[in-house]
Amino acid sequence: FRVTTRLVPGPLAELIADPDRIMAESVLTSLVDSRAERLGSAASFAAWAEPVLGAVDADGFIARRVREWSLFKVLQSGEAVDRAALAASSNWLQRKVVEEADSATVLAVLGETGRTKRIRNLAKTRAGRLRASGQ
């Protein structure tokens, strides 16, 4: 990933500048995942992730992971489903949505647009269960 550390605070800047790119990307991915899990809203995660996005390659894995976490948080908040973004998302995100989504609408969209037959079938099944339980 690209190194631009001037907007990134202390330890994060050191991590991004680490010469061992594979290790740095692995640690940064873990950091992004743990922060996304801890920060409740899409807005709070976006505020935390802004300097990270400014420091990494826009087309790289870390930027994609941040964008996918942002999409997941938006989907969890009940906002409208971006069908194209959900369809284009990675298997990782689609599996996460199937496992954790509380919205039958989100799951129904994924049931139509999922990347794999397994994801589509699981999403349809969960959507049906949520509808049957009145959620």
Please give the residue ranges for each predicted region.
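Alpha-helical scaffold segments
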Residues: F1-Q135
